[in-house]
């Protein structure tokens, strides 16, 4: 049934559906931004009105979310429809949109999937202090662990945030991370206070 509905839509609509499926939820503005299509919001609203695979939530804003199986189908179609490089580019765009609209877990996962280490590292460093204050030590550690070890080792701020996030649970590893961060800061002349 899903395949039948999908096949009967025009190419532009199929692309909107596949691109918006890269995010777990969207507003009309997010749909348009992530798909690059000015009618994306209308397409998603129409699917909802027709009762086709879309849920709607209204809190501070109206958000749409594809049914899980439909989203999974669309994500599978992305891998068939797009070449690897184009799909990677679309995922990076989706990561930037997710970050902009505070879908942090999604942004982190998409940056990691596309091996956008600079963007992922920047985002982690921007979030590090806030996450520690919120007590989200393990989530911060999960984010950092998505980067390959070699990437972590050459980024003193990642080592610093890794050490800080481990202090409570693994003080020995925390000390190793913090010492490595200190050595990196010394070597690069970077200022830990800045």
Sequence positions of predicted segments:
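Short, intrinsically disordered, charge-balanced linker/junction segments flanking boundaries
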Residues: 98, 178-179, 185-194
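C-terminal boundary/linker of central alpha/beta nucleotide-binding cores
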Residues: 2-79, 179
């Amino acid at each position: 049934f899903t395949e039948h509905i999908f096949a009967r839509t025009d190419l532009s609509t199929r692309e909107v559906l596949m691109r918006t499926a890269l995010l777990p939820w969207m507003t009309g503005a997010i749909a348009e931004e992530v798909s690059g299509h000015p009618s994306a919001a209308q397409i998603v609203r129409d699917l909802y009105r027709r009762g086709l695979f879309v849920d709607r939530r209204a809190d501070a804003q109206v958000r749409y979310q594809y049914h899980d199986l439909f989203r999974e189908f669309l994500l599978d179609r992305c891998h068939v429809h797009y070449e690897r490089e184009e799909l990677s580019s679309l995922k990076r765009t989706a990561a930037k949109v997710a970050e902009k609209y505070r879908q942090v877990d999604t942004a982190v996962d998409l940056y990691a999937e596309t091996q956008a280490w600079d963007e992922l590292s920047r985002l982690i460093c921007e979030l590090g202090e806030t996450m520690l204050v919120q007590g989200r030590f393990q989530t911060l550690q999960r984010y950092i662990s998505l980067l390959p070890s070699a990437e972590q080792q050459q980024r003193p701020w990642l080592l610093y945030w890794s050490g800080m996030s481990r202090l409570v649970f693994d003080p020995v590893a925390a000390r190793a991370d913090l010492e490595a961060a200190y050595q990196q800061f010394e070597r690069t002349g970077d200022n830990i206070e800045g």
